[in-house]
């Protein structure tokens, strides 16, 4: 831990903490994208893309019953390749019919294992609370049923990711498939391509991976599959490249926006992570029609990240009380009560919210969304202040106290209301916004998963620089346990909360009629942090896998 000296209003000098955050690994790299020449429409490619799209639609709309396994494989491939947003109507129709057939048929137990697991996964992913009883017949005879068939084992493994609490057969399936796949990887006779595919699945199961990252990996893999659909690879490559150009244009704009505000220079104690912030937004929604949503989300993530660093690292407790009060009042006249660095931040915060409100003024629910975003920001200030008080006093809260705060302090409510604002008033009705701000169970499960994953990978670094106790310290002190044992327990809890995510996704779609598009943003938010915190704190220390992910989506081009 290091310190530096900064002036405060009464001219006394105060020694401040510093986390010595790494500089941005990107610097001004994406500002150069502003100078790129606009892409001229390639009419030949556009025509070819449209023809391929129509060809895929025809195959989805074919009605031959004997083709069901092939059609399910086609849907799975479309989803893995990240182009399912083009075929939502067709896929919804097919899976709705399939669900009806599945729950009324008495012969599903005779299915081939691959077909059964694929059908189960596709239906659960869609939000159908399909029974897992069909897996019961394999209990005690997994090896004889699957016999080291890699494709079947991968299908079983991916299906088991969508298990709920109490589904013991799927718990068994997960353990069996994982062990078998790990053995295949260790076998020196296994084809290297197969090893790569299995390793990818073991680290990044489809349900817990970001769709765009999944697509960037799977496009090359799918092209080599002997059973591939001939139209899909080219269509997926063209679509990926087209979207990438849009995303590059957006990151250039947002980089300039950040540069114009001068946050990196004026608030140099904070993390300069505007590129990573855009990657977060891209993870939550990548579709072309949600461009404005990504830009709004990135601005909120950026301004929220600085707020976190003020409370977490730089501000004195007395200054933080002033800032919390200023947030509650939400008025520029409050700036005169704040120290210089806070004044700059507070004015920028209010300006960003006003800027977003003006950008979205055409949307019917904008005033209500903006109001709820402000309320969520005020709430963040209050819980950040509680954490600052705990840190100042050296207090280790109980696990229950910690989780009550953690549900709020990760910012899920603010992020999700921002997502709804960007998605538009057709989806973001006042009723849906109220549902999100009530912190429904699916959002609570997501917040706990993200908080625990963050604590597991970052608690040592944070404790070294002086930080509020994490879940690890809370568990250790309350239960007199070793760090090793606590990490095992928290890992198991994360698995259980993923099961809650699956169950609540299905329940909310069927019983509360929340649009699938809204729930998908909650799921993508959880996937995002699963990716970011998989190998460490990929936001604070973004030079490793996070940089690789960003490069694959925003820098590297696919050969067409």
From Swiss-Prot:
GO CC, one annotated term: cytoplasm
Intervals of motif DDXXD motif: 308-312
Cofactor binding comment, as recorded: Binds 3 Mg(2+) ions per subunit.
UniProt EC number: 4.2.3.46
InterPro entries given in the database record: Isoprenoid_synthase_dom_sf, Terpene_cyclase-like_1_C, Terpene_cyclase_plant_C1, Terpene_synth_N, Terpene_synth_N_sf, Terpene_synthase-like, Terpene_synthase_metal-bd, Terpenoid_cyclase/PrenylTrfase
Keywords, alphabetical: Cytoplasm, Lyase, Magnesium, Metal-binding
Binding site for Mg(2+) 2: 308, 312
Leading EC class: lyase
GO MF term list: alpha-farnesene synthase activity; magnesium ion binding; sesquiterpene synthase activity
Cofactor list: Mg(2+)
Binding annotation for Mg(2+) 3: 462
Subcellular location(s) of the protein: Cytoplasm
Broad class of the protein's primary localization: cytoplasm
Keyword Cytoplasm: yes
Pathway, per record: Secondary metabolite biosynthesis; terpenoid biosynthesis
Superkingdom of the source species: Eukaryota
List of residues binding Mg(2+) 1: 308, 312
One GO term (biological process): farnesyl diphosphate metabolic process
Pfam family of the protein (one): Terpene_synth
Expression by tissue: Expressed in the rind tissues of ripe fruits.
Comment on protein domains: The Asp-Asp-Xaa-Xaa-Asp/Glu (DDXXD/E) motif is important for the catalytic activity, presumably through binding to Mg(2+).
Name recorded for this polypeptide: Alpha-farnesene synthase
């Amino acid at each position: 831990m290091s310190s530096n000296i900064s002036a405060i209003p009464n001219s006394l000098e105060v020694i401040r903490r510093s986390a010595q955050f790494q500089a941005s690994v990107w610097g001004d790299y994406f500002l150069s994208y502003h100078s790129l020449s606009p892409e001229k429409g390639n009419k030949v490619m556009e025509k070819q893309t449209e023809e391929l799209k129509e060809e895929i639609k025809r195959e989805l709309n074919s009605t031959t019953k004997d083709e069901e396994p092939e059609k399910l494989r086609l849907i799975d491939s479309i989803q893995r390749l990240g182009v399912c947003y083009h075929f939502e109507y067709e896929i919804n129709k097919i899976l709705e019919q399939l669900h009806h057939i599945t729950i009324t048929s008495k012969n599903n137990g005779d299915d081939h294992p691959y077909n059964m697991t694929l059908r189960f996964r596709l239906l659960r992913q869609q939000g159908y609370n399909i029974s897992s009883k069909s897996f019961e017949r394999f209990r005690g005879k997994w090896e004889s049923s699957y016999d080291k068939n890699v494709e079947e084992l991968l299908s079983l493994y991916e299906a088991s990711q969508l298990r709920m609490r109490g589904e013991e057969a799927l718990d068994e399936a997960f353990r069996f498939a994982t062990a078998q796949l790990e053995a295949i990887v260790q076998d020196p006779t296994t084809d290297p391509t197969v090893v790569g595919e299995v390793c990818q699945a073991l680290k990044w199961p489809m349900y817990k991976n970001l769709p765009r990252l999944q697509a960037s990996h799977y496009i090359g893999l799918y092209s080599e599959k002997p059973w591939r659909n001939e139209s899909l690879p080219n269509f997926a490559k063209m679509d990926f490249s087209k979207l990438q150009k849009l995303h590059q244009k957006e990151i250039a704009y947002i980089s300039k926006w950040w540069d114009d505000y001068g946050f990196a220079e004026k608030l140099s104690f904070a993390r300069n992570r505007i590129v990573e912030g855009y990657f977060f937004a891209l993870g939550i929604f990548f579709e072309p029609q949600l461009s404005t949503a990504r830009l709004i989300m990135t601005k909120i993530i950026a301004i929220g990240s600085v707020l976190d660093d003020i409370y977490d690292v730089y501000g004195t407790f007395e200054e933080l009380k002033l800032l919390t009060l200023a947030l509650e009042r939400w008025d520029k006249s409050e700036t005169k009560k704040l120290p210089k660095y806070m004044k700059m931040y507070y004015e920028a915060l209010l300006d960003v919210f006003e800027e977003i409100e003006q950008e979205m003024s055409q949307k019917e629910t904008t005033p209500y969304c903006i109001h709820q975003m402000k309320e969520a920001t005020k709430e963040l200030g209050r819980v950040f202040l509680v954490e600052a008080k705990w840190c100042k006093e050296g207090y280790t809260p109980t696990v229950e106290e910690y989780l009550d705060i953690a549900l709020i302090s990760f910012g899920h409510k603010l992020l999700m209301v921002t997502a709804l604002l960007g998605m538009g008033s057709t989806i973001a009705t006042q009723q849906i916004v109220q549902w999100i701000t009530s912190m429904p169970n699916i959002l609570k499960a997501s917040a706990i998963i993200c908080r625990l994953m963050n604590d597991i990978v970052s608690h040592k670094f944070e404790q070294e620089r002086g930080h509020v106790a994490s879940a690890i310290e809370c568990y250790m002190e309350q239960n007199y346990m070793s760090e090793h044992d606590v990490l095992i327990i928290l890992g198991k809890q994360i698995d259980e909360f993923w099961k809650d995510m699956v169950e609540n996704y299905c329940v909310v779609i069927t019983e509360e009629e929340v649009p699938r598009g809204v729930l998908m943003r909650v799921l993508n938010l959880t996937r995002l942090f699963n990716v970011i915190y998989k190998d460490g704190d990929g936001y604070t220390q973004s030079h490793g896998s996070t940089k690789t992910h960003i490069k694959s989506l925003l820098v590297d081009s696919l050969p067409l």
